[in-house]
Amino acid sequence: MTQTLSQLENRGAFIERHIGPDAAQQQEMLNAVGAESLNALTGQIVPKDIQLATPPQVGEAATEYAALAELKAIAGRNKRFTSYIGMGYTAVQLPPVILRNMLENPGWYTAYTPYQPEVSQGRLEALLNFQQVTLDLTGLDMASASLLDEATAAAEAMAMAKRVSKLKNANRFFVASDVHPQTLDVVRTRAETFGFDVIVDDAAKALDHQDVFGVLLQQVGTTGEIHDYSALITELKSRKVVVSVAADFMALVLLMAPGKQGADIVFGSAQRFGVPMGYGGPHAAFFAAKDEFKRSMPGRIIGVSKDAAGNTALRMAMQTREQHIRREKANSNICTSQVLLANIASLYAVYHGPVGLKRIANRIHRLTDILAAGLQQKGLKLRHAHYFDTLCVEVADKAAVLARAEAAEINLRSDIHNAVGITLDETTTRENVAQLFNVLLGGSHGLNIETLDKDVALDSRSIQQSMLRDDAILTHPVFNRYHSETEMMRYMHSLERKDLALNQAMIPLGSCTMKLNAAAEMIPITWPEFAELHPFCPPEQAEGYHQMISQLSDWLVKLTGYDAVCMQPNSGAQGEYAGLLAIRHYHESRNEGHRDICLIPASAHGTNPASAHMAGMQVVVVACDKNGNIDLDDLRAKAEQHAANLSCIMVTYPSTHGVYEETIREVCEVVHQFGGQVYLDGANMNAQVGITSPGFIGADVSHLNLHKTFCIPHGGGGPGMGPIGVKAHLAPFVPGHSVVQIEGMLTRQGAVSAAPFGSASILPISWMYIRMMGAEGLKQASQVAILNANYIASRLKDAYPVLYTGRDGRVAHECILDIRPLKEETGISELDIAKRLIDYGFHAPTMSFPVAGTLMVEPTESEGKAELDRFIDAMLAIRAEIDQVKAGVWPLEDNPLVNAPHIQSELVAEWAHPYSREVAVFPAGVADKYWPTVKRLDDVYGDRNLFCSCVPISDYQ
């Protein structure tokens, strides 16, 4: 029969590109699990009372090319003015060698958070370099491997200051009045839930206030003034006040390190080290503190350790501080941070080196001096005598200046009384400065830049002598070697090949949804129309962004069954926090602010209790029954016990045990009965889309991990996006923003992120995914994710018991393999299996979560049958190896499992093991072998001998 034009157009072509198994393979797998069709399998697994009759209507699928053309037209509505707004965001020049070989390279952006250090040494080294940059520039002892943005880093600094403060009865936090307004906004939001009083005043008056546990100063104020806070910090320290300083990476190249002035904590944004503004993000924040406070620091910290052979190796250090272990007692709720962006900043520093960075910083400052000199020569007054890159210029006719700026397609900062702000950056040229003269002076001015340059070069006093840096920075060889593009390209490749990412193998991490990040989805993030917009530009310049965000929000509303979506939270953990704040403020609006009990199942992800604590709630744990489901009797008892103060429940669906709980609606009803709200964690949304939805189930609010379900890549540990969907009654209580008031924003509540739409520049990834999949494709993706998980479970269940199943012995989109019986019988642990999988070319599944002694496997819909079979074959081969240990063929203390992973150097070393070299390194054959570069790490050594800065090059050789 002749095909129709519609069939030939094949608008759903991307669906087959995204979903791994083709129709024939799907049928083979369905036969293996005993189901007739995807719909039949879904019908068996998902409780009937929550199944949607039809998929949410988000439109038909579009081809990659059609979707890209459509989004390009939308992006074209954005106006790319030259922005001198500043406020922590500047234009940058991302070196093309980093753009092509890292940002656009799936070997970097598809990797996962480096919990498995043996397959993560490349990005761990890049992150260690980032920490070294932070240490050198801040003058402190300990640095983290990035936080979400500068404003949330400020909030973390406040929380940390309280943790380490010796003034236990003090409950006030002082903020200098010239911090960035978005920073103050987020600090106030966080302080409210912690019960802190925030004092905002001129820094000179910090000593006038009593009962202050911490002070936040900004080295270069929001309107540009450089402050020498040495004396103030000394006096504050004498009073045992914890001092935090917000700083700027580029300014710190020239300015005195705040740590040398006595600051306890220094933080800021690393955005201007090569990361585009992107209408607000994603960007990495840096965070450093004194050594004595290291165990109270938030976020990931990369440390130097040893592997089993005694070689230098890197790992995430001191994880016992973090949410996945300490839960509500964690220092922070951070899970995803900003690894990809931190690594861009790290490599930017490596590529330019100290000499290049000083040249860039000095050029920015020179152009600022030239601009200042010319304006003053023509009679304009500067509000501050000391500055680095930002001028606050007093103008008589501000409206006329702003009109001339708009006509010249220039954005100036306009929210300063009787003045405008101008921040220059590394993209600024002498031609730009000449144009700024025209805008500010109103026509012909007769100023000569060459003449002005000679004048300021001889007599620049805009940086106080006391504030000039007097020590060397970035002296480590890594920052002084890779300055040609050839060397830089090879260095980045050498790092990349140490790691295991999705471009090499499946990453079957349960609860992480490591699905395809398609090239067509990634292309728009580097379009200048999206990448170059300042987050505080006039709304009419961002109409393309607003259209894209509005469409994406509308699709997410339909897919979740909620009434509204807020895009501000820039990670899943931030989404949890924002959702819980919405619940808190809702109760307060009903004069029920006393409701502060958050029920959390024992199986919950560690971010849940950590977020509840941050939102000012008390955690009450609800038991799970022997099948892994929420114990309804225990839930009822605790809901009734705390009825007067019940705020909410946080529940994940499908559960973290990998099953669709039959009683989920009853759970919602019980909580609602006693006055609580239902927070449904969106971590497992990949098993809901098109099949059911949180709103349909009965939940009130959820966050969505766009970096899981909706294809934003994990980036080796960030970026992420965690927008929240809410029912109508919670919509007035989602985060707002103090700087930008955009029509259509839902609320005027405080902010949780620095930018109004969080990490806006990665939202096109999720837009593209939904647009190319369409309603039917999205449902099919969920169904194949379920099929793939059940196929693995059915083929492995005889070798490794599946811990929890639902009806008919089925699982949802992931399954938990119970290793405990094997360990008891043979001594081989889940850790041994995880490390042995590296020899077979796989990243390990999730270890010991949510149950100790288990492996949780989530294959996603993107993996084809061949890759699933390869993984299954590896797991079965490992089981056969365990049997060899059990039979005594290999001793427990010397076998391929306990010695895994094996590295190349072992092949040429003396071999004393009872198994062959071939068994060690080629258990799955020699084709496309992944070689780890270190053996199993010594975690105890790493934490007992904490070292978090760059090691000598010889240690890597």
Curated annotation (Swiss-Prot):
Its EC number is 1.4.4.2. Pfam families: GcvP2_C, GDC-P. The modification N6-(pyridoxal phosphate)lysine is found at K708. Its cofactor is pyridoxal 5'-phosphate. It catalyses: N(6)-[(R)-lipoyl]-L-lysyl-[glycine-cleavage complex H protein] + glycine + H(+) = N(6)-[(R)-S(8)-aminomethyldihydrolipoyl]-L-lysyl-[glycine-cleavage complex H protein] + CO2. It is an enzyme of class 1 (oxidoreductase). Disulfide bonds: none annotated. The keyword Mitochondrion does not apply. GO terms for cellular component: cytosol; glycine cleavage complex. GO terms for biological process: glycine decarboxylation via glycine cleavage system. Transmembrane segments: none annotated. Keywords: Oxidoreductase, Pyridoxal phosphate. CDD domains: GDC-P. GO terms for molecular function: glycine binding; glycine dehydrogenase (decarboxylating) activity; pyridoxal phosphate binding. Belongs to the GcvP family. The glycine cleavage system is composed of four proteins: P, T, L and H. PANTHER family: GLYCINE DEHYDROGENASE (DECARBOXYLATING) (PTHR11773:SF13), GLYCINE DEHYDROGENASE, DECARBOXYLATING (PTHR11773). The glycine cleavage system catalyzes the degradation of glycine. The P protein binds the alpha-amino group of glycine through its pyridoxal phosphate cofactor; CO(2) is released and the remaining methylamine moiety is then transferred to the lipoamide cofactor of the H protein. This is Glycine dehydrogenase (decarboxylating).
